[in-house]
Every structure is written in C-alpha cells, then in structure tokens.
C-alpha cells in the first residue's frame, strides 16, 4: 500500500477541515534540503538540550537547591521535558495555521530567555519557572514545527528525511553534556547557562532563516471539532496509545541507566559516559533504519525496532551487572530507541491529512509527554519497593515496549491486513 493511498484514505475523519488543493511534493531541491538542515539544527537546540538537563541534578542539589531532596530537584528537569511535549498540540496547531516561522520565532525567544533567566536563578520556584516552564514551552514551539516542516517537502524519502531531522537531537545529546561537564567547574553555573544560551541563539538564527513549509497555511477560527476530530480516527488513536507505551518504556533506561550502573559497581565517571554513548549511538538509530524504512515499509521497520528494544531491555539490561554488558546495552539501545523516535513522526504523516499534520504530530507527542512524566517516578518507586534493585524497573520498561509493539501491530493489520511481506 502506497503512502499516497494511505493519505487519501485518512481524509474521512477530518472532513470539517478547509479544503486545500494538495501541494506538489518535489522530493528534493535546495529549499527542501535547507529545511531539513534547519530543522535538524532546531532539534539540536531543543530536544538535544533537554537530553542533557539531567546533568544539572547534582549541580542544583550541591549549590542552588542543596536544601531540597533529590526527588524534589528531579521535578525541574522532568517538567521541562513534560512542558516541551505536552504543549505540542498548541505548537502543531500554530504550524497548521501560520506555518513554521511564527511558532519557531516565538519559541526561539522563550527558549533563550528562559535559559538566561535560569542563569540568574537561585531559588526552586525561579528554576522551575525559567528552565522548566518558559524554556520548555519555547522548546515545544521550536521542536514540533521543525520536526513537521520537512515532511511537507518529501513523499518517497520521508523516512530518511525524518531520520536526518531528529538526528540533530542525538548530536545535541552528545555535545551539550560534554559542554556542561567541562564548563561547570571552570566558569560556574551562571556562565555555563549563558554560554549555552548564546550558542543556542546563534543556531536558532540559522533555523529561523532556513525552515519553510511546502504546504499552504491558512489561519482557522477556533473550533472544538478541529481538536477532537482526529481523536475520532481509530487508526490515529491506536498510534497515540502505542506511542504512550513506547515512551513509557524508553525513558526508564534514559533516566536510570546511570544510577543503575553505579548501583552495580561502575565508577561514577564511567557511568556518566553512558549518556553520550547512548545519544551518540542513537544518531545511527535515527538515520539508518529510517533509510531502510523507505524501502521496506515504515511500520514494518518500526515494529522490528520496538521488538528489539523490548528484547534488549529484558534479555540484556535486566541481567547486566558488568561494565561491558552495560556499555553494550547503552550502545545497542541507543540505536533501537533512536529509530523509534526518528520513525514516529513519519508514521503520523503516513496516516494523516496534510492540513492537520502539525496538530496530529503535537497530539501524539502530548500522549508521549504523559509517559515521559510518569515513567521515571513509577520506575523509582518500583526500585525503592524492591530494596534498591532495578530488576522489576527493567521488567516494567520491557513490558511497556511489548504493549506498544502490540498497538503498532494492530494498527498495521488495520491498514494492510495480515500479510507479513506487505510494504507499509
């Protein structure tokens, strides 16, 4: 079943949307590839930045917030991720109505302003407002339109284009942790934040200039049906639910691989190196599988990658105790989890009308936001109830991946039937 037929087949649930002539999709060209480059840079400074904020946990506990528990401090970093994803439906609706320039420009100001204010913050509420709320919402206004815009320029190459776009977040997840680790002891917290903010500002100038959309955007009056309409589409709801469980599973290793490694005897310095290893490997996970997906079918490759993620968690991370096993898991899980993040937007495009693409991407990310916010506390509570062991926390992650895989498999059957060799 082709992408074109799928797109046409999903116009039914959104009949209330304004009728716009379908744009010509060039599948290449200077403007299209500049959009991919700008979008990758935008994800570098938004999603890539959020990948490294856990490094501030020890800084806050030692200095600015030394009177607070580690659990209290962790809300600052987890809430930034939550705000980035949960406000994505609003970012997506702005994209659908005005194109990428308006939301990305507003987001650029908020993201940089939030980080600058965080550099001056000394109290809990100040850091929560500046880093979690203002910077988080700004990241959402950058992240969602940037991830969506390149998809309007391509049809046959959507997989690899989606992978190249989100690969920027992988590079950010490597560069920013290394920057922060080296800058904190040399220039202190304030100037570390300012240097990162100035770097982000410069890169966002490039993103604002280069990102464009191939779709005609028209402002729409507020209508409840525009917001609830996609949720009447069974295929879309299945993808939302599957995404929730996949993100429920993904963020357990992201959040606990370091503390679990230290718990089982790895040195602190080596344990922290697992973060750039995982993020570095995810670069390949967000590009190579996406290229294969354009040839073999995007749903097919996604289901394989979610299954492999479950196997890695349950068969490798769960019994792992030595340094070699944990490093191997970090690298391999970086590849499979990177593919899940990279292919996610491409699947949304495949079952959605272009006129609602931004909002639908944002809605799926909002479901994912609930997973990212709740899975770390649940995983921590499971470990605490098990005497500090992470055995059942790993099981929770692996089972979440399996449930997400079943949801994707059910959606694939609805779209193309039971044929295992069907490209879908």
Swiss-Prot record:
Phenotype of null mutants: Does not affect the production of oxopyrrolidines A and B.
Compartments (UniProt record): Membrane
InterPro entries tied to this protein: MFS (IPR011701), MFS_dom (IPR020846), MFS_trans_sf (IPR036259), Proton-linked_MCT (IPR050327)
One GO CC term, this protein: membrane
Biased amino acid composition, Basic and acidic residues: 1-10
Membrane topology (UniProt): Multi-pass membrane protein
Principal location listed in the UniProt entry: membrane
Glycosylation sites: 208
Record GO terms (molecular function): transmembrane transporter activity
Any Pfam family hit: MFS_1
Keywords: Glycoprotein, Membrane, Transmembrane, Transmembrane helix, Transport
Record's keyword annotation contains Transmembrane: yes
CDD domains: MFS_MCT_SLC16 (cd17352)
UniProt keyword Lipid metabolism, yes or no: no
Residue ranges crossing the lipid bilayer per the database entry: 36-56, 102-122, 127-147, 160-180, 187-207, 239-259, 265-285, 299-319, 329-349, 364-384, 391-411
Region span, Disordered: 1-23
Similarity section: Belongs to the major facilitator superfamily. Monocarboxylate porter (TC 2.A.1.13) family.
Chain's role: MFS-type transporter; part of the gene cluster that mediates the biosynthesis of oxopyrrolidines, polyketide-amino acid hybrid compounds with feature structures of tetramic acid.
Protein name per UniProt: MFS-type transporter opdF
Naturally occurring in which organism (per UniProt): Penicillium oxalicum (strain 114-2 / CGMCC 5302) (Penicillium decumbens)
